[in-house]
Amino acid sequence: MIRECDPNLDIAMTTNGSLLSKYADELAKSGLNRVTVSIDAIDDQLIREISNSNVSSKKIIDGIIAAQNAGLKIKINTVIIKHFNEDQIIPLVELFYRMRVVVRFIEYMDVGGTQNWNANQVVFGDEIREIIEQAFGRLTPVN
């Protein structure tokens, strides 16, 4: 329906990925071009704590694979929280590098006071970059 308004329109969505394996083909056939999946950990316990749900990393990753197979462009958004999921940076980079999926690390920020945000929990972009570069060497920009 949206695609009919403009055949060149870039249609995207952001999701936690929990239903993506079920709907990726249908979404692609409906005209979706790309999807951003929010995943803040590979560790299932951390995912449960962050999302307050029982979604597993396997379910999310299976959804990402289904989206790839459906021809959708994919990006990953990951929020890193100091002393909580910092240890997930390298496993996330390794996994999505192997899958050829771009990961964007996003600084933890106040979203209206709904998550008991604390400035001391912020891991800044340069800190994340340093952790990654210590493990893999100098990073280069991706367009």
Which residues make up each language-model segment?
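Radical SAM/AdoMet-radical enzyme domain recognition
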Residues: 1-102
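Auxiliary Fe-S-binding modules of radical SAM enzymes
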Residues: 94, 98, 109-143
